[in-house]
Structure formats: C-alpha cells, structure tokens
Amino acid sequence: MATHSHPHSHTVPARPRRVRKPGEPLRIGVGGPVGSGKTALVAALCRQLRGELSLAVLTNDIYTTEDADFLRTHAVLPDDRIAAVQTGGCPHTAIRDDITANLDAIDELMAAHDALDLILVESGGDNLTATFSSGLVDAQIFVIDVAGGDKVPRKGGPGVTYSDLLVVNKTDLAALVGADLAVMARDADAVRDGRPTVLQSLTEDPAASDVVAWVRSQLAADGV
C-alpha cells in the first residue's frame, strides 16, 4: 500500500463546500465504476472506525438494495445505521444532479441517531465521469481497480482527476492482468494536482490502513 502525490499544478475547477449546520456529521462520498470495490472499502472503513465514531452508511443502487444488504449481512454496523436509496436510473443523477432522495435519507439517519460523526455515502457503480454534488458530501473518494488495466488513470475524467482521494484498488491482481502499478501511480499523479492517491489491496490489508488514515485526517480537520 502506497500513497502518492505530485506537486506540479494544473488549472482545476473550484469545488465549493456545502454549508453545514452546527453539529452535522461529516459526509464522505465513495464513488467509482461497478466492481471496483466500493462496498468492500466501505465495509472496511466501518469495521475500523465504528469503535471510535458514531457512523452511518447510505448506499445507492439502481433497482435493488444489494450494497446495503451486503453491509448488513456482514454486520459492519447495526442494521438501522445502514440506509439505501434506489435511484431508478443513472447512478450519477442521484448523487450529482437531483440529490433529493439522498438528502431525505440522510435526514432520516440523523433523526434516528443523535450526534453522528460521519456518514459514508456510496454511489451506485458508474463511469469515470461520476462525481458527487458539493451539496451532498464534504469530500469524495473515487475507487478504480487494476482490472481495467494501467491505462485507467491516464484516461482521467472528473472522478479520477478531482476526487479528494483516488484509490487504486485490488493491487494484488496487477500481475495477473498485466497492470503496471508504477505507471498507474505516475499517471494519477500527473492529473491530480497534488491530491493524494492510495494504491491498496484489501486482500493484503483488510483494514484499508491508508484510506482509514485519510478519513481520520478529514475528521481531525473537521474537529471530530
């Protein structure tokens, strides 16, 4: 597991932060393509942080509650701390264009659980253009994996380029699919304007140590 950053600058669009009310939890989005390992990462974050924080999770699926069901089955949090939105259409619409259903679900989680510290919002599987509305989350993680080949970071796209943290997942499979991790790290650094990139394998590090450390840094900056 390695963290990479690259100091040279690019012109990037400003991403305004949402205005939070006093006492509102930090909200971190977890997005990325289908099968990249978003739900497994959310599960790992819950396992590592549930002993120190008041947590909740909100998942997005098109027609099912598959991801929420997975998290409940694996008991990463009590069932009532895991909610699901069925988007009924393109996953990015519910996290970027019309976030009403997600905001309503967040309100319900906050009403049910006083003094939440953190809500993880997992998007449905989408492509490299998916990003979260700044009205929905305070920071966003974008997850890709090596199965798509080492060209994926080079292709860029808003998720790869502008997410607050890029995670290159399933690094243990790199040799099997012919992906060069050094190339992926280099190409990610080249487009991310110094934003951090983590290369990880949940098989080798089930605790997702580098991502957990990043989440803790976001919470510390937030005063949690």
Curated annotation (Swiss-Prot):
UniProt entry tagged with the keyword Chaperone: yes
SUPFAM superfamilies linked to this entry: P-loop containing nucleoside triphosphate hydrolases
UniProtKB keywords: Chaperone, Cytoplasm, Disulfide bond, GTP-binding, Nickel insertion, Nucleotide-binding
Feature: compositional bias, Basic residues: 1-20
Pfam family membership, one: cobW
GO cellular component: cytoplasm
Principal location: cytoplasm
Subcellular location: Cytoplasm
Residues the entry annotates as binding GTP: G32, P33, V34, G35, S36, G37, K38, T39
GO BP, one annotated term: urea catabolic process
MF-aspect GO terms: GTP binding; GTPase activity; nickel cation binding
Residues covered by region (Disordered): 1-25
NCBIfam families: ureG
Family as reported in the entry's similarity comment: Belongs to the SIMIBI class G3E GTPase family. UreG subfamily.
Summary of subunit composition and partner proteins: Homodimer; disulfide-linked. The physiological role of the disulfide bond has not been proven in vivo. UreD, UreF and UreG form a complex that acts as a GTP-hydrolysis-dependent molecular chaperone, activating the urease apoprotein by helping to assemble the nickel containing metallocenter of UreC. The UreE protein probably delivers the nickel.
Its job: Facilitates the functional incorporation of the urease nickel metallocenter. This process requires GTP hydrolysis, probably effectuated by UreG.
Record protein name field: Urease accessory protein UreG
